Every structure is written in C-alpha cells, then in structure tokens.
Amino acid sequence: MKAILGIKKGMTRVFENDRAIPVTLVDVAGCKIANIRNGKVELVLGSKKKGTKAQLGQYKEIGYVPMHRWLVKGEIPEGLKLGSDMVAETFNKGDVVAICGISKGKGFAGVVKRHGFKGGPRTHGQSDRLRAPGSIGAGSSPGRVFKGTRMGGRMGSDTVTIKNKRVVDIKENYILISGPIPGSNGDLVKIYIQE
C-alpha cells in the first residue's frame, strides 16, 4: 500500500539538468494510520477540537478524533503499526502517482466559461446575445428540455483525479510533484500509486 494524505502548500520550481520543472509542494506531516477495517487501512490527517465518546474510543490508538479520513485497500507497510506516522519516504523519487483533490470553485458560470460554447455573433445588429446559450431544445415535440442539456450553473468544487504525475523530489515532510494538482493552497489531497 503506497498512499498518503497531504495538504497542498503551493507551487515553485526545481532545476534538473539545467531545466526548470514546475512542482507542487504537498505537506504530508501528521498523516497517521488509525484503523484496519475489512482489508482496508484508514489514514487520517488533522484533528477536531471535540469528539463523541464513541469516536474517541474508535481512535484511541492516535488519541484524538481526526478531521480527514481515507480508507485505502492494502496492508500496513512493514515496520509500521496502528498510530504510526506515514512519512514522505513512503514514496520514492521518480514514482508515478495519481492525485485526488477537490477543484477550485468558480461559482455560477455561464455556458461560454463552463462548457466552451462559442456564443452568438458580435456584430450584424446583435446587441446582447454574445455569451447567451441559444436554443435549449425543440418545439412542442418533445415539449421539454432533455436531461443533461448543457447550461449555465455552478462550476468547480468537483472531485478530480489527475494521473501520471511524477514525484520529482522528497524533502523532509514535503513531496514535490510535477506540475499543478487540483485544489487551492491548504486543501486536502490524496496521493497514491496507480494500480
């Protein structure tokens, strides 16, 4: 099992063979192994101020109620036990990983931004149809708008998984991953080796 929870900290660059490579820093300090359930390992990160007695009993190995939890298929890595910290060295330089996070929220967006619609003509007497969606259906038959018709609406804040990202370097509690990853700085990300 090669998986870890981390917090996105921002982007920078590193140099390899006189080439600048953009990287994202992910802070993995504080990720612990909390439980084993049905052949899955529960990784946790962060802590809540309060928890119920049931939750405190469930997480007595780590001594607090976690903020973020993630169940991962697999066995506990060798040399680690319940309550142990997962360290950045779980991964190796050059590993190809997948990263799962929640994309930045954009709020209510129109069809041009959200779906890439071309919009209407800019000239020839057109005054206010430039970024409009246009027709959304036929006439009295079918007499309704089909489900899934692309329209304006809330954009972003979706769970996004990006694959084939390379671990460029590992420094202390930070994993440096090539290129951008989903989410804002300070957001939770899940990093794992692709199966």
Stretch-by-stretch model annotation:
Residues 1-195:
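Extended basic (Lys/Arg/His-rich) segments that typically form rRNA-contacting surfaces
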